[in-house]
Amino acid sequence: MRQSANLVRKHIVVTGLVQGVGFRYFTVTQARRLGVQGWVRNCRDGSVELEAQGSSDAVQALVEQLAIGPRWSEVSHVAVHDMPIIDETARAFGVRQ
């Protein structure tokens, strides 16, 4: 995980054209590259939901990448909310069903 003074956990919902375009796998790739832990999944309403925990810098960088998205996506909004930090020692970022 990138070094930072602050460990944060965020609940994030991304809306727009974000399903069927590789958005979850893009998210996993970016999160792992940044050393962020958590999960991502598709929602029935067409959005993508995730929880991300890591240094404040790494999570902010992930949010910035989510706002861009993979090539075929069209992100209309990224909602970010604070969550309590949990112990996820050694858990890799992954896809949930």
Swiss-Prot record:
Domain of life from the UniProt record: Bacteria
This protein's encoding gene: acyP
Active site positions, chain numbering: 24, 42
PANTHER family recorded: ACYLPHOSPHATASE
A Gene Ontology molecular function term of the record: acylphosphatase activity
EC number: 3.6.1.7
Swiss-Prot/TrEMBL keywords: Hydrolase
Cross-referenced InterPro entries: Acylphosphatase, Acylphosphatase-like_dom, Acylphosphatase-like_dom_sf, Acylphosphatase_CS
Name of the molecule in the record: Acylphosphatase
Catalytic activity: an acyl phosphate + H2O = a carboxylate + phosphate + H(+)
Family, as annotated: Belongs to the acylphosphatase family.
Keyword Hydrolase: yes
Domain Acylphosphatase-like as annotated: residue spans: 9-97
